[in-house]
Curated annotation (Swiss-Prot):
One of its GO terms (biological process) is cell division. SUPFAM superfamilies: MurCD N-terminal domain, MurD-like peptide ligases, catalytic domain, MurD-like peptide ligases, peptide-binding domain. Pathway: Cell wall biogenesis; peptidoglycan biosynthesis. Signal peptide: none annotated. GO terms for molecular function: ATP binding; UDP-N-acetylmuramate-L-alanine ligase activity. The keyword Lipoprotein does not apply. This is UDP-N-acetylmuramate--L-alanine ligase. Keywords: ATP-binding, Cell cycle, Cell division, Cell shape, Cell wall biogenesis/degradation, Cytoplasm, Ligase, Nucleotide-binding, Peptidoglycan synthesis. It is found in: Cytoplasm. It comes from Agrobacterium fabrum (strain C58 / ATCC 33970). HAMAP family: MurC. It comes from the Bacteria.
Amino acid sequence: MKMPKAIGLVHFIGIGGIGMSGIAEVLHNLGHRVQGSDQADSANVQRLRDKGIEVFVGHTADNLGDAEVVVVSTAIKKNNPELIAAREKHLPIVRRAEMLAELMRFRNAIAIGGTHGKTTTTSMVATLLEAGNLDPTVINGGIINAYGTNARMGEGEWMVVEADESDGTFLKLPADVAVITNIDPEHLDHYGNFDAVRAAFRQFVENVPFYGFGVMCLDHPEVQALVGRIEDRKVITYGENPQADVRFSNVRIDGTRSIFDVEIRRRRTGKIFSFKDLVLPMPGRHNVSNATAAIAVANRLGISEADIKKGLASFAGVKRRFTLTGEANGVQVFDDYGHHPVEIKAVLAAAREACKGRIIAVHQPHRYSRLSSLFDDFAHCFNDADTILLAPVYAAGEDPIEGASSEALVSAIKAAGHRDARFLEKREDLASQVAAIANPGDFVVLLGAGNITQWAAALPSELKSISGKSE
């Protein structure tokens, strides 16, 4: 039985979250009555209001109104007054992943999983399916620049979703195609140990039906090891590895574009198809790898080489994924969500390939627990930056942990051999410090999952003010 239309008013607690907002938008577009609440106004909240969805700011029991279903994410605490009121009324409480799973039952579904690269890969798959006239429905974990939103309602039979592994609920998603970009030891607060993370990703792929398939990155050692353990399901491998079914090669970086070739090998027939000089308007091998995953999916769904090339060339990117926020005096400023050492290393490597000048990295560590558990990795992930400015930790509600501070990380980075790592004590000092060291042709890359995105948006105009120039 699929979810009926007559389920009554659906209330989202925390509707402004990136995952919740996309589900709410698609439900609304399907004709359901939707409302919600969030603790603060935001761009996501305003976007939902613009679409006719009522959103309350603040959490009170009265916000429920005549709601008949309540949707919550794992971020909502048990003492939330709306959640308490919903339980007192004996309303159905639906977890975010469960509601996403219900939406997926209306379509053939592609779920993109992995510790890093999910949002970009989801966007790329959606772009290629759209280029192939499959008109997909999309629910992503980031704002797709071409849509101006993280959700899209299509008329086609396919849905593309980002599968969030952080709390294990991605195993509820009924995917026909499961993509794994990589597997790293993240979210151990939920899983307990890395073996449990490995087991979850194995289940993610083995959950696909017999007529579905997995798409797995052979360049990542954990994913490669998992490929050999998958039983009774079709798997397509991709990557730079010569053994991959869909292999990219001949990567050339041209400014902020990547140009590369892809070779597709059919295991059953041995046939080989070659796509030459694919153009992706993003730098970096990690983005080429993500694009290759999308190509593997699109090719298997019958999308032509011409449409794949057209779709890739038109890809407009994702908000906060190496996003240019402005330029001041020849210095370009970029905003990126990277907050894990693997992500930071990949972004800075891409910047190094694209930049003719120097790289100035500004990082705001996100959560004391992450900095503490990955401290050594953080100390070695900034090598492609010429200068590093480390802001205080964005706590995200956590208490400090001894030894897990930005000052300690600066010392560790220097001890690892980096020549120029500095502590940025106050946000107000950012523009003056950058202005003192940046020259025309340099890139300033701001990285983090906290409020550093606001710094990135403001920095170009602040740099212009310091130089006395304005446009």
